[in-house]
Structures are given as C-alpha cells and as structure tokens.
C-alpha cells in the first residue's frame, strides 16, 4: 500500500465517489490511496506475448493437452496436432493445474477454483466516472470500479467452489451484485449491460505455488495465484526463473522477505 494512503471522512467520500451513500445508512469513513493504479490487462498480456516471441518462444493456442508422460529424463506432452519434448515442463494451467498434474502422474496439490462474478452497469445519465477510484467495502461486501467514462463494473466478491470450467454467472449472484450496488449507492440498477464469471484458484494455504514437484523430476508448479496473477506476475516470474533454472534468489524478493520455501509445493505435502 502507498505511504500516502490516508483516512477520509464521509464528506470526502461524497466528493470522490458522489453516488455512495454516506452517514448512518451508508459510509462514515474510508481509506483513500491516491497513488493506486489500474493495470491494463490486455496490454500486459500482449507485451508478455511479444517478449516471449522475441526470445524465440511460440504460443500455440487451440492445442489442448491430451497426454503427458515421462520418458527417461524427459517429458513428452501430446496435443492433437503435435507432441512436445523437454527435460522440464511448467504447469501453469490455472484452474486446471491439478488436472494437468494428475495427467502427468504427479500428485495434485488440492487446488480449489473459486468462481467470481462481475456485472457491468451504467452510471447516472451524464455522469463521467472515469476518475472514480476502485472502491471496496471493508470485509465482505462488494467492489466497483470504472471502465471508461460511462460504465461501472461491480463484483459481489463471491467465492463459489467450482470444477475447472468455462465459468458462467448464475442469476442469483448477478442479482446479489445489483442489490449490493443499490444498497450502497444512490444508483437504481435498471439494466445490466454485461455479466461474466471467472475462476480464481487457490492452494489450501491461500499462498501461490512456484517450484519443482517433490515427487517428479523436471515438473515445475506455477499455480494458485488466487486471482492476483497480473498483480503478482513480475514477482512470480522472477521467482519462477530463479527456482526453475537454479539461479540466485532475486534481490527484490529478498528485500520483501519472501522465502522460496513459502512458495514451494513441498510445503503442501507435510
């Protein structure tokens, strides 16, 4: 968190996000961080893809894994169009990471995909919301944030256990998200422009996993980011590079007192 984050009173809340209800039936105070920024997820993904290709890598989409087997000191990964061979493989399959491990004959970690839902709504007519901050209630509740000048995204912070799948929102959770917005703001929700769900996958201890499987040579876990994959990707990339290639632990991670053992899949085998 920014050192410039500060507590604000209800009148300040009304100035920053004018639709929020304040007072006894609403918000009476808050914490405001003027230095927080929203990540451009598409720009990050495209930039990383370009960096991968520039380094000689390739991205093969629409290539579902049909089999993984260990042959000698190598792994062979089968897809409908081609098989790939390497002395090490990285399991970064998100909600499917445990399934990929099982396919490879590696013990799963007990990862749990949790469904989360987003709705897109319109602010009051003529109101530009582009400068509004990401706004979240303390504890359970909801959050909302602007997307451009004329649309808001809202989330009820649902965490519904799910099988790995192309998650779809359910009507009850959509209604809950709209109700929470109406309870916390002066905006009546007359229309939901769009709705979708995604899966956030957690290890049993809620910490991310990066490291070689203790029961399989050359099988590297990179999973369990719990919905914070974009935010943690620079640090997790440094950790994964060091751990997979046997390099010195990166100084930025050491400076934050992050220990490789905290990420190791071995911690989940005790």
Residue map of PLM features:
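A short alpha-helix-loop-beta-strand transition element characteristic
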Residues: 1-14, 108-111, 247-255
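Conserved beta-strand-loop-beta-strand element in the redox core of flavoprotein oxidoreductases
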Residues: 66-84
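Flavin (FAD/FMN) cofactor-binding and adjacent substrate-gating region
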Residues: 1-55, 60-61, 67-73
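C-terminal lid/capping helical subdomain adjacent to the catalytic/cofactor pocket in oxidative enzymes
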Residues: 7, 214-270
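Mid-domain beta-loop-alpha active-site segment that forms a flexible
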Residues: 32-51, 94-96, 173-180, 229-232, ...
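Hydrophobic/aromatic beta-strand patches that form the interior of the parallel beta-sheet core
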Residues: 60, 90, 220-222
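Active-site substrate-recognition segment that forms the wall
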Residues: 83-84, 88, 93-218
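Short loop/edge segments at beta-strand edges and connector loops
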Residues: 9, 61-63, 79, 194-196
């Amino acid at each position: 968190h920014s050192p410039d984050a500060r507590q604000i009173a209800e009148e300040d809340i009304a100035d920053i996000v004018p639709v929020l209800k304040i007072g006894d039936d609403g918000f009476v105070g808050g914490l405001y961080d003027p230095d927080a920024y929203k990540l451009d997820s598409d720009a990050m993904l495209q930039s990383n893809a370009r960096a991968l290709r520039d380094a000689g890598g390739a991205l093969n989409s629409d290539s579902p894994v049909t089999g993984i087997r260990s042959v000698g000191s190598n792994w062979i990964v089968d897809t409908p169009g081609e098989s790939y061979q390497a002395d090490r493989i990285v399991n970064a399959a998100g909600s499917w990471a445990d399934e990929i491990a099982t396919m490879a004959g590696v013990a799963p970690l007990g990862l749990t995909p949790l469904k989360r839902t987003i709705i897109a709504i319109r602010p009051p007519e003529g109101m530009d919301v582009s400068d509004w901050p990401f706004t979240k209630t303390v504890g359970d509740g909801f959050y909302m944030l602007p997307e451009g000048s004329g649309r808001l995204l809202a989330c009820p912070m649902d965490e519904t256990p799910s099988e790995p799948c192309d998650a779809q929102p359910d009507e009850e959770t959509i209604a809950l998200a709209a109700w929470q917005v109406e309870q916390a703001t002066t905006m009546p929700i007359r229309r939901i422009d769009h709705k979708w769900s995604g899966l956030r996958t957690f290890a049993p201890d809620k910490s991310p996993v990066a490291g070689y499987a203790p029961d399989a040579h050359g099988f590297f876990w990179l999973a369990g980011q719990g919905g914070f994959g974009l935010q943690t990707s620079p640090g997790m990339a440094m950790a994964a590079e060091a751990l997979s290639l046997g390099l010195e632990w990166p100084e930025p991670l050491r400076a934050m007192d992050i220990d490789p053992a905290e990420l190791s899949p071995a911690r989940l085998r005790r």
